[in-house]
C-alpha cells in the first residue's frame, strides 16, 4: 500500500496553451503594422547591390576584360555584360547577367531630396551600351571606371512622399580613379556615407 502525497503532473493544460497562443496573436496584431518592412527591404537591396558592384570590379581585374553594368530603369534591374571584346556592345559569345534591384525598390529620388554632385536624374552616366542604348558603367580591367557618375535608388513609398519613409533613399557614386562604388543614404536632413 502506497501512502504519501499524490504525485503532481508536469506540463501545461490545453486551455493554458490556447491562452498563450491568443496572447501572442494579440501582441503580433498590435506590433506588426508598426514594423517598416520597406526600410528593411531597401537596406537589404542596397547591401546586395553594393556587394555585386564590388564583385564586378574584381571580375574585371580577374578576367582582364571590361565589365559593362547597364542600368535598366523600367526593368528595375542591372545588366552586367562580361565584355570580352572590350567594345561596350553585347556580342553573341558574351555573357549577360541580370540583377534585379529588389522588391519595392525603384531608380530615382524624391523631389524633396537634394541632388548629389553627379546630377539629379535617376541614372547619371553618359556612356550607353551600344546594342540596347541603356546607360552604363564601364569598369576597366585595371579596376578603374570610365567616368564619374551615379544613380539613386529609393522605395516606392519614399518616392510617393509617404510619411516615415523619407530616409529610404540611397545614392551610389562611382569613383573614376578606383572604380569603387560608394554608397550614401539620405537620413532626412543630409547624405551620410555607408549602408
Feature map (PLM): residue ranges:
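N-terminal helix-rich module
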Residues: 2-21, 25-51, 58, 66, ...
